[in-house]
Protein backbone atom coordinates (compact mmCIF):
# COMPACT_ATOMS: atom_id res chain seq x y z
CA UNK A 1 0.00 0.00 0.00
CA UNK A 2 1.28 3.46 -0.85
CA UNK A 3 -0.01 6.98 -0.42
CA UNK A 4 -1.42 8.78 -3.43
CA UNK A 5 -0.20 12.22 -4.53
CA UNK A 6 2.17 12.56 -1.59
CA UNK A 7 5.81 12.10 -0.64
CA UNK A 8 7.32 8.63 -0.91
CA UNK A 9 6.55 6.55 2.16
CA UNK A 10 3.82 8.86 3.48
CA UNK A 11 0.10 8.17 3.95
CA UNK A 12 0.42 4.40 3.60
CA UNK A 13 -2.80 3.70 5.44
CA UNK A 14 -5.32 0.92 4.86
CA UNK A 15 -7.83 -1.26 6.76
CA UNK A 16 -5.77 -4.42 6.18
CA UNK A 17 -5.45 -4.95 9.95
CA UNK A 18 -9.09 -4.11 10.64
CA UNK A 19 -10.71 -7.35 11.82
CA UNK A 20 -14.25 -6.17 12.56
CA UNK A 21 -16.83 -5.26 9.95
CA UNK A 22 -18.01 -1.65 9.96
CA UNK A 23 -21.43 -0.20 9.24
CA UNK A 24 -20.26 0.61 5.73
CA UNK A 25 -19.04 -2.95 5.20
CA UNK A 26 -22.42 -4.35 6.20
CA UNK A 27 -24.19 -1.85 3.97
CA UNK A 28 -22.01 -2.80 1.01
CA UNK A 29 -22.57 -6.46 1.80
CA UNK A 30 -26.33 -6.00 1.54
CA UNK A 31 -26.08 -3.82 -1.57
CA UNK A 32 -22.78 -3.84 -3.52
CA UNK A 33 -23.91 -0.75 -5.44
CA UNK A 34 -24.05 1.35 -2.28
CA UNK A 35 -21.29 3.94 -1.93
CA UNK A 36 -19.41 4.35 1.34
CA UNK A 37 -17.21 7.43 1.72
CA UNK A 38 -15.25 8.38 4.85
CA UNK A 39 -13.84 11.87 5.44
CA UNK A 40 -11.59 12.75 8.39
CA UNK A 41 -8.54 14.84 9.23
CA UNK A 42 -6.80 11.86 10.81
CA UNK A 43 -6.05 8.82 8.60
CA UNK A 44 -6.94 6.36 11.37
CA UNK A 45 -10.35 7.98 11.79
CA UNK A 46 -10.93 7.82 8.04
CA UNK A 47 -9.79 4.20 7.66
CA UNK A 48 -11.84 2.91 10.58
CA UNK A 49 -14.91 4.84 9.43
CA UNK A 50 -14.56 3.74 5.82
CA UNK A 51 -14.07 0.08 6.62
CA UNK A 52 -12.72 -2.50 4.20
CA UNK A 53 -15.12 -1.96 1.31
CA UNK A 54 -15.58 1.81 1.25
CA UNK A 55 -13.30 4.68 0.28
CA UNK A 56 -11.46 6.94 2.70
CA UNK A 57 -9.96 10.41 2.45
CA UNK A 58 -7.84 12.17 5.04
CA UNK A 59 -5.78 15.32 5.32
CA UNK A 60 -2.05 15.47 4.65
CA UNK A 61 -1.18 18.02 7.37
CA UNK A 62 2.09 19.09 5.78
CA UNK A 63 0.45 20.08 2.51
CA UNK A 64 -3.07 20.85 3.65
CA UNK A 65 -4.38 18.56 0.91
CA UNK A 66 -6.76 15.61 0.90
CA UNK A 67 -5.22 12.25 0.10
CA UNK A 68 -5.92 8.53 0.12
CA UNK A 69 -3.96 5.35 -0.53
CA UNK A 70 -3.58 2.67 -3.18
CA UNK A 71 -5.77 0.35 -1.12
CA UNK A 72 -8.78 2.41 -2.18
CA UNK A 73 -7.78 3.79 -5.58
CA UNK A 74 -5.23 3.26 -8.33
CA UNK A 75 -5.05 7.03 -8.64
CA UNK A 76 -6.50 9.82 -6.53
CA UNK A 77 -9.94 10.70 -7.97
CA UNK A 78 -9.86 13.61 -10.40
CA UNK A 79 -12.33 15.64 -8.37
CA UNK A 80 -10.07 15.41 -5.30
CA UNK A 81 -7.09 16.63 -7.31
CA UNK A 82 -9.13 19.57 -8.60
CA UNK A 83 -10.29 20.34 -5.09
CA UNK A 84 -6.72 20.34 -3.79
CA UNK A 85 -5.77 22.86 -6.47
CA UNK A 86 -7.97 25.41 -4.70
CA UNK A 87 -5.55 25.32 -1.73
CA UNK A 88 -8.37 26.00 0.69
CA UNK A 89 -6.17 25.23 3.70
CA UNK A 90 -3.56 27.79 2.64
CA UNK A 91 -6.28 30.41 2.26
CA UNK A 92 -7.09 30.02 5.97
CA UNK A 93 -3.59 30.85 7.19
CA UNK A 94 -4.26 34.59 7.19
CA UNK A 95 -7.44 34.18 9.21
CA UNK A 96 -7.60 34.91 12.92
CA UNK A 97 -9.24 32.69 15.48
CA UNK A 98 -11.76 35.22 16.74
CA UNK A 99 -13.66 34.23 19.92
CA UNK A 100 -17.43 34.03 19.59
CA UNK A 101 -18.09 35.75 22.90
CA UNK A 102 -16.65 38.24 25.35
CA UNK A 103 -14.38 36.82 28.06
CA UNK A 104 -17.07 37.05 30.75
CA UNK A 105 -19.52 35.02 28.65
CA UNK A 106 -17.39 31.86 28.72
CA UNK A 107 -17.81 29.17 31.36
CA UNK A 108 -14.21 27.92 31.29
CA UNK A 109 -12.51 31.18 32.24
CA UNK A 110 -9.84 29.67 34.49
CA UNK A 111 -7.75 28.25 31.66
CA UNK A 112 -6.72 30.04 28.47
CA UNK A 113 -3.61 31.11 26.58
CA UNK A 114 -5.52 33.98 25.05
CA UNK A 115 -4.95 37.47 26.39
CA UNK A 116 -8.30 39.11 25.67
CA UNK A 117 -7.18 42.56 26.78
CA UNK A 118 -4.03 42.56 24.68
CA UNK A 119 -5.61 40.92 21.65
CA UNK A 120 -9.31 41.71 21.68
CA UNK A 121 -9.72 40.85 18.01
CA UNK A 122 -8.77 37.23 18.53
CA UNK A 123 -5.79 34.91 18.38
CA UNK A 124 -3.57 37.18 16.27
CA UNK A 125 -0.45 35.47 14.97
CA UNK A 126 -1.76 32.31 16.60
CA UNK A 127 -0.26 29.95 14.05
CA UNK A 128 3.29 31.13 14.77
CA UNK A 129 2.99 30.57 18.50
CA UNK A 130 1.72 27.00 18.94
CA UNK A 131 3.25 23.58 18.47
CA UNK A 132 6.99 24.05 18.43
CA UNK A 133 7.30 20.46 17.20
CA UNK A 134 6.66 21.68 13.66
CA UNK A 135 10.10 23.05 12.84
CA UNK A 136 10.30 22.38 9.12
CA UNK A 137 9.24 24.70 6.33
CA UNK A 138 7.17 27.65 7.63
CA UNK A 139 4.16 26.82 5.44
CA UNK A 140 4.21 23.17 6.48
CA UNK A 141 4.37 24.29 10.12
CA UNK A 142 1.40 26.59 9.61
CA UNK A 143 -0.73 24.07 7.73
CA UNK A 144 -0.23 21.43 10.41
CA UNK A 145 -1.13 24.01 13.07
CA UNK A 146 -4.50 24.54 11.40
CA UNK A 147 -5.66 21.23 12.83
CA UNK A 148 -5.28 22.67 16.34
CA UNK A 149 -7.80 25.40 15.59
CA UNK A 150 -11.48 25.52 14.56
CA UNK A 151 -10.27 25.96 10.98
CA UNK A 152 -9.49 22.24 10.98
CA UNK A 153 -13.21 21.61 11.34
CA UNK A 154 -13.88 23.96 8.43
CA UNK A 155 -11.57 21.91 6.21
CA UNK A 156 -13.56 18.76 6.95
CA UNK A 157 -16.96 20.37 6.38
CA UNK A 158 -15.93 21.92 3.07
CA UNK A 159 -14.47 18.69 1.72
CA UNK A 160 -17.47 16.67 2.90
CA UNK A 161 -19.78 18.95 0.91
CA UNK A 162 -17.61 18.42 -2.15
CA UNK A 163 -17.71 14.65 -1.66
CA UNK A 164 -21.51 14.64 -1.47
CA UNK A 165 -21.77 16.48 -4.78
CA UNK A 166 -19.00 14.88 -6.83
CA UNK A 167 -19.41 11.34 -5.54
CA UNK A 168 -23.13 11.82 -6.32
CA UNK A 169 -24.14 10.40 -2.97
CA UNK A 170 -27.83 9.70 -2.56
CA UNK A 171 -28.61 10.25 -6.22
CA UNK A 172 -30.03 6.80 -6.99
CA UNK A 173 -32.08 4.07 -5.36
CA UNK A 174 -29.09 2.54 -3.57
CA UNK A 175 -28.42 3.66 0.00
CA UNK A 176 -25.11 5.51 0.37
CA UNK A 177 -23.14 6.29 3.52
CA UNK A 178 -20.95 9.30 4.26
CA UNK A 179 -19.03 9.31 7.52
CA UNK A 180 -17.53 12.59 8.71
CA UNK A 181 -15.07 12.73 11.59
CA UNK A 182 -13.87 15.98 13.14
CA UNK A 183 -10.49 15.35 14.77
CA UNK A 184 -9.64 18.95 15.67
CA UNK A 185 -11.75 18.85 18.87
CA UNK A 186 -9.53 16.08 20.22
CA UNK A 187 -6.33 17.89 19.24
CA UNK A 188 -7.50 21.22 20.67
CA UNK A 189 -8.57 19.51 23.88
CA UNK A 190 -5.22 17.75 24.22
CA UNK A 191 -3.22 20.91 23.60
CA UNK A 192 -5.18 23.54 25.52
CA UNK A 193 -6.90 21.35 28.11
CA UNK A 194 -10.53 20.18 28.32
CA UNK A 195 -11.57 23.10 30.57
CA UNK A 196 -10.03 25.84 28.42
CA UNK A 197 -11.79 28.73 26.71
CA UNK A 198 -10.24 27.50 23.47
CA UNK A 199 -12.13 24.20 23.70
CA UNK A 200 -15.37 25.91 24.68
CA UNK A 201 -15.10 28.41 21.84
CA UNK A 202 -14.24 25.65 19.38
CA UNK A 203 -17.42 23.75 20.28
CA UNK A 204 -19.57 26.82 19.66
CA UNK A 205 -18.03 27.05 16.21
CA UNK A 206 -18.28 23.29 15.60
CA UNK A 207 -21.98 23.41 16.42
CA UNK A 208 -22.43 25.86 13.55
CA UNK A 209 -20.25 23.74 11.26
CA UNK A 210 -22.39 20.67 11.84
CA UNK A 211 -25.55 22.72 11.40
CA UNK A 212 -24.31 24.05 8.07
CA UNK A 213 -23.38 20.57 6.86
CA UNK A 214 -26.68 18.99 7.87
CA UNK A 215 -28.53 21.93 6.32
CA UNK A 216 -26.59 21.38 3.11
CA UNK A 217 -27.48 17.68 3.10
CA UNK A 218 -31.16 18.41 3.66
CA UNK A 219 -31.14 20.94 0.83
CA UNK A 220 -29.73 18.33 -1.57
CA UNK A 221 -32.52 15.86 -0.93
CA UNK A 222 -35.66 17.93 -0.52
CA UNK A 223 -38.69 16.08 -1.95
Regions found by a protein language model. Name each.
Residues 1-174, 183-190:
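His/Asp/Glu-rich, glycine-adjacent segments
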Residues 194-207:
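Active-site-proximal segments of metal-dependent phosphoesterases and phosphodiesterases across multiple
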Residues 181-183, 195:
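Mobile, glycine-rich extracellular loop/lid and propeptide segments
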Residues 205-223:
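Metal-dependent active-site segment of extracytoplasmic phospho-/sulfohydrolases and closely related
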Residues 162, 199-201, 215:
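A cross-kingdom marker for long, charged
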Amino acid sequence: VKGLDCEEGENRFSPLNLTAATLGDRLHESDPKSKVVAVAEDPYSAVISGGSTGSAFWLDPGKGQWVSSSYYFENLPFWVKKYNEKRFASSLLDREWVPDKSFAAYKNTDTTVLNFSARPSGFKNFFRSILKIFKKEPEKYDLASLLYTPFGNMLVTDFAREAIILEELGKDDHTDLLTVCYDSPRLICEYFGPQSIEVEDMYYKLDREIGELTGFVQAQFKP
